[in-house]
Amino acid sequence: LDEIDTDAVACFTVGAEPLPGTRPWPELTEGQPTTPPPDRTTGSAMHYTSGTTGRPKGVKRGIPELEPDVMGELYAGFQQMFGVQPRDGHVHLTGSPLYHTAVLMWTGNSLHLGHTVVLMDKWTPEGMLERIDRYGVSTSHMVPTQFHRLLALPEDVRARYDVSSVRCMVHAAAPCPPWRRVPSAPAA
């Protein structure tokens, strides 16, 4: 908080009922302009090291010298490579901690593009299927181990959930052999 020159923490909720200790979003925005501020800047995400040589540390990066609208177009362009368009009704499931760079970027990009984001407190294979079914999840970002654990679930467990809403699953962090990418693909 010292870096942003404030001694207050803003806690707010978006939704039907405010949580204890928070203020409803409409109360915070009442009387505020509806147009972007004239001096706005792009900002930058704080990424974290893996912590292999100690505790994870935040890595402060420079602010990109791009207009915020240009940065938004870059976010949109990145996800369009995967067939994900701005404001097209996608629901992104985040099942890993946001301190992982790729997870934070996919989640942040989804929010920038106007998509709904569903956060999991703790990832489990069946928990993921349940959320896909309940929220109509269309995209997610996972590591190959998560794919393996999903495929290791018994068929009767997998069959309980409707996952027809899924349009794009992206993996990173480790190689994923081609024969594991598609369960019906023949082994090489």
What spans do the regions from the language model cover?
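ANL superfamily adenylate-forming
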Residues: D2-M46, R55, P64-G77, L153-P154
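A short helix->loop->beta-strand "cap" motif at the edges of active sites that frequently abuts
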Residues: D5-C11, H115, S164-R167, A188
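Adenylate-forming
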Residues: L1, A16-L19, S96, E126, ...
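Conserved S/T- and glycine-rich ATP-binding loop of Class I adenylate-forming
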Residues: T49-T52, H92, L98, I132, ...
